Amino acid sequence: MKNILLAVDDTKGSKEAVSSFARACKCINPDRLILLHVEKLEGRSLIDGMLGDPEMATLKETLEGTDYKEALDRRAKRILDYYSKAMSENDVQGVETMVRVGHPADEIMQAAAEEGVDMIIIGSRGKRTSHLFMGSVSREVADRSEIPVLLVKSSGST
């Protein structure tokens, strides 16, 4: 595994995925680790069926420069700085950060393809019934991916 994409946000599952990766990193020893944070447009799931890709692209462009987008960017920077520091403290080399905007599973899959990664690592909340109603980003990534996906379940999840 030379190129790994580690999808991160500010959830417990993400923190545990990063912690697990940091412990295993000496064995894996990747050349490149991409920390990816996806800025999710709130309400995206409600408008999924109503907007196609061109309309979503227009919405993303419209948000550029707004207070809302700036708040999303500050949050993304804080999250990526936190995980970059954790990787540095564990002597992980080759760390890159990336921010994308949109539906998390779509953006993770697209980034993985564009960057030619060998594996995706993502935290999982581990809730047994939540995916029945709202779907699960980690489950969707695992189902759609043609490369290995490591799901790290949060301890203490039900």
Predicted features along the sequence, with ranges:
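Short secondary-structure boundary segments
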Residues: 37, 123-125, 153-154
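Small/aliphatic-rich secondary-structure junction motif
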Residues: 2-63, 90
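General small-molecule cofactor/ligand-binding pocket signal
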Residues: 34-36, 96-100, 150
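A short acidic, glycine-rich active-site loop
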Residues: 58-78
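Short, flexible loop segments at boundaries between secondary-structure elements
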Residues: 147-158
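Structural beta-alpha unit
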Residues: 74-120, 156-158
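Glycine-rich, Arg-bearing micro-motifs that act as flexible, cationic patches
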Residues: 119-140, 158
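Short, structured coil segments at secondary-structure junctions
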Residues: 137, 145-146
